[in-house]
Amino acid sequence: MTEPGSTGSVTISVHRRKPSSMTQSDQHHRPGSEGEHYVQEVLGTTDRADRFYRDQMLDHLNPAMREFIARQEMLFIATADLKGECDSSFRAGPPGFVHVIDDHTLAYPEYRGNGVFASAGNVIQNPHIGLMFLDFQRERIGLHVNGRVKLTEDERLRSHVTDLPLPQVPGQRALMWMVVQVEEAYIHCRKHIPHLRKVGADESWGTDDMMRKGGDFFGAKQEREARERHSPSPTAAATGWL
């Protein structure tokens, strides 16, 4: 059986269970994507998924979720461009660096970083975003938040949200904020979340020191330079000096 809309290259070779009794209207009102509903139907997990949707998935941030986010120092994010090409990234800051504005809205800052702005560039084309908060230290639990993003300049957002957190480094303001309109919020179970402890390392907020930022840890620059040393320059090739 091939996945709907595929070219036939993705096949789920299991026996399909009897068609669901759900109507098109029922399917339309279920949380989640059409693709996940299809896989649930094929693998026979629709009832199990519906229990999770019913018991754990909200379209807003309840008080427990808001308090949880306010304690977090790490955030994993996922975005995709107009073609659906994906990018995952990581953000970190002191507790409260992700600011819950209200039950349906949160925001986190975007700094210059390496200057690429892959996540910001993606959401200009495709505003959907997935956030993952994982508490490794205290609760050993996770929180998914999915929604739509608007990029907002720092000064403009501060004029409307007066309790927005101050910069992590004095004098270094965010260039912009990712303002997320929450569409889904739900638990990530603790079953395989390890218990970690902080060792008091210097976070080096805002540093431009390449070594403190990790330098060329994976050797990508070294690899490029080695390749260039062993490749003839365009000028040499054009003049025949090889």
For the regions a language model picked out, list residue spans one by one.
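Intrinsically disordered, low-complexity segments enriched in serine/proline and basic residues
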Residues: 1-4, 9-11
